[in-house]
Swiss-Prot record:
Chief subcellular location: cytoplasm
GO molecular function, one term: metallopeptidase activity
UniProt lineage: Eukaryota, Metazoa, Ecdysozoa, Arthropoda, Hexapoda
Organism per entry: Anopheles gambiae
MPN domain residues: 20-152
Oligomeric and partner information: Component of the eukaryotic translation initiation factor 3 (eIF-3) complex.
PANTHER family reported for this sequence: EUKARYOTIC TRANSLATION INITIATION FACTOR 3 -RELATED
Name of the protein in its database record: Eukaryotic translation initiation factor 3 subunit H
Amino acid sequence: MASRGNRARSQPVDNTISYVQCDGLAAMKMVKHCHEESLNNMEVAQGALLGLVVDDRLEITNCFPFPKSDETIDEEEYQLNMMRRLRHVNVDHFHVGWYQSADVGNFLSSTLLESQYHYQTSIEESVVVIYDTQKSARGFLTLKAYRLTPQAIAMYKERDFTPEALRNLKVGYENLFIEIPIVIKNSALCNIMMSELTELVPEEEGTHFLDLGTASVLENHLRCMMDRVDELNHEATKFNKYQQAAIRQEQEKHRMLAKHAQENAARIAKGEQAVPEEEVNKLFRPIPVPTRLNPMIVSGQINTYAQHISQFCSQSLAKLYMTQALQNAKDNKQ
């Protein structure tokens, strides 16, 4: 654990973007799209982010959703047409990244890593914004912006996911992404309107914040975590089998080389020419090393689920203590 902590602390810092400024309109469009997809067919919602870069600040001023996977539409042509139409109505049309909804608070996947790699190599300042639908539905608006670290970009450039390559690059699930601070900004007129709407909203008694029916949320997180643990165990078994096969092959190779050396010594004693060792090496083909990218991603998913469960349980315990105090106060009054 200490080595992982030291590795995370020694990672290079990406200073391309210091923070992301998102307009309220763009945030609302992302939230609306992600919730509609989660209610309709539980698919992952994705879309393009538009805006501009000012110094070290990335401004997101608008967005639009990507077409669904089952639609026969050329995605690149669709994006170009959308940006062209936005430009005609004097809207920022520069592509600055993309957004995606999170699956039970977990977004890490090989597809997302691959997509963000292509975005950052073509658009240096691009970010991916993750929206957590389930956590936001419980009253916590969760919008987070991420960028790939220099180590992760180097890993994808080399396309070598062997243990040795990941060790040399010092890449782990802890330093795949850099979280960029994100702030939501509204115009002065929007802030005035929000202040007026606040006065029209009836006051809530606040009892819904003490809802203790949280078993389904915790059960869902635990079930997802158990699935990821099973998958990681399967990957570990696969890698252990590779190591055992590599050890057996190496032992057999040493035995054959020793036998070959004895035969060569006998040939030399008889005055015959020795046979080169390459003939023995040709008999042993290198065993392909299993990729370690998927186990690293699964480990990151398990870590995320563990953090969410810990945070969720802490909030639930706080609710229990608050409810107990309110109940005791009610009993004392009676």
